[in-house]
Amino acid sequence: MAAKNKIVYICSNCGFESAKWAGKCPDCGEWNTMEESVKTAVSAKSAASGYSSSASTLLTRPLAISEIDTEDEHRYHTGLSELDRVLGGGLVKGSLVLISGDPGIGKSTILLQICEYLGQKLRILYVSGEESARQIKLRAGRLGVSSPNLRILAETDVQLVVEHIRTEKPDIVMIDSIQTMNFTDLNSSPGSVTQVRECTNAIMRCSKSLDIPAILVGHVNKDGAIAGPKVLEHIVDAVLYFEGDRQMTYRILRAVKNRYGSTNEIGVFDMGEAGLRQIENPSQAMLSGRPTNASGTCVTAVMEGTRPLLAEIQGLATTSGFGTPRRMSTGFDYARMALILAVLEKRAGFYFSNLDAYLNVVGGLRIDEPAVDLAVAMALVSSLTDTPIRDDTVVFGEIGLAGELRSVSHIESRVSEAYRLGFTRCVLPYHSMKSIDSKRFSGVELIGVHNVREAFDACVQ
């Protein structure tokens, strides 16, 4: 006897499933997120599951790890070295990659640019649920994409998409976007928790069985998280986030999950009329246009994975026009900024209690490593005292609650990047001096300091 469909309630935020409705999700605690959905019988979906009977048979026998052949493991280079860096060396066969970001950030653009390079030798199937084939052609023309092996499919029915993949057998599949795909057998609208989960599963199974890499575009919700169930991020092999303000040209591509590489790498791009242009020297780009002999600005060296990056920190302290002073931070943790302000008042005698304090990381970067603490403090104190930090100085170090400076990692990489871009002075924690070979950096004056007061004196002398 065929199984019957049943009504369930699924949280649109976390994907929690319940047999009855509730105002508050028992799992994530969000209110008014439980949505009614019809759970379709397994038999109704089996035709579009993405598995063939032969593929299932092959996967049923356990294999000894020594029997598994990995000699033919191959990565497709995308033509964008910055993207390859984030992916861990390129696209792995049979992998499922999710690219997410705000609307207009460049997700579809980067897919078409990948098509232009890979499409010279490989067959690519580009599936769009948001645009017609004509619209994609017009956008591709603007970007200069004219690959002979690129096939466009404007379709939202995932069952038909899987069928086309099995028929065409492309080398790479791109889905733009996963939230527009739907199962016609499911009684829920595209983009719902059930639809997103089942459509992703179908594409994943098809991709794995045919050993075809697939790139999915994912929308984000108002909080910046990927729209749909959290299980979506567990299904895919890699999750890449595009960061950056649409009003600015810089874009940061960051991996938050990667089964085939590091999650500490970033790729830096510049969005222009001709699409995304990769920036292979991001430090120089981030510091372009930096004001000279101006108070409230400080250069620091941060580590993004194995890549050292110079960034400009800007601080502003000004008289408050309200009873309660305002605090605002862009690109740096607000709570960490408040902690640094408290340390400056208590341990160094720089008072911000009656002043508004603003902090900005230039270029749209988001920095969360403790090594930036000292640069944040120096930028704010420089603005408070209206005393410029020397233009040839790079600052980094972690600040403790006693006002002391703690050592940070990758000292030599940070100093090397600063020296490469012409900086001749580095103010760093005194204890970090032991881990650096000063003979390698004869052209850089290394100044070890014990606390924030010493650091400020060293920065302005």
Feature map (PLM): residue ranges:
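Conserved Walker A/P-loop ATP-binding site and its immediately adjacent core
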Residues: 129-135
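Conserved RecA-like ASCE P-loop NTPase motor core of nucleic-acid helicases/translocases
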Residues: 124-128
